[in-house]
Amino acid sequence: MSMSDPIADFLTRIRNANMAQHESVEAPASKMKKDIAEILKNEGFIRDVEYVDDNKQGIIRVFLKYGNDGQRVISGLKRISKPGLRTYVKSDAVPKVLNGLGIAIISTSEGVVTDKVARAKKIGGEVIAYVW
């Protein structure tokens, strides 16, 4: 059976593993998922990301990050643009998540970027998710 929204599945796997205090989580790989994982790593929400080639689609392994006292770094993940209701923003309407404390992940003509990069480059696109 095919999955209707693989990005939502990826974000849900991260959210559930994070809530259960797991060390890492695996998901089927895709270019979009790799880009999202790299953004989460660069923004400090996850510790590391690893790609495993299994002679098929590949697997993306995300290593979650926690504070010294076990406090979760990712307090929330929300899918915004869904297959049934795509959400696009113009360059002058790029959202701020929690007044800049979180990030919006946006798919633009220049690749998958954060809201800060989209605002700096003055480009809009499809709002994939909010992370805070």
From Swiss-Prot:
Pfam families membership: Ribosomal_S8 (PF00410)
One GO term of the biological process aspect: translation
GO cellular component: ribonucleoprotein complex; ribosome
PANTHER family recorded: 40S RIBOSOMAL PROTEIN S15A
Family indicated by similarity: Belongs to the universal ribosomal protein uS8 family.
Quaternary structure and partners: Part of the 30S ribosomal subunit. Contacts proteins S5 and S12.
Protein purpose: One of the primary rRNA binding proteins, it binds directly to 16S rRNA central domain where it helps coordinate assembly of the platform of the 30S subunit.
Protein name: Small ribosomal subunit protein uS8
GO molecular function: rRNA binding; structural constituent of ribosome
Keyword hit for Aminoacyl-tRNA synthetase: no
InterPro entries in the cross-refs: Ribosomal_uS8 (IPR000630), Ribosomal_uS8_CS (IPR047863), Ribosomal_uS8_sf (IPR035987)
Gene field: rpsH
Keyword terms of this UniProt record: Ribonucleoprotein, Ribosomal protein, RNA-binding, rRNA-binding
Residue runs in coiled coils: none
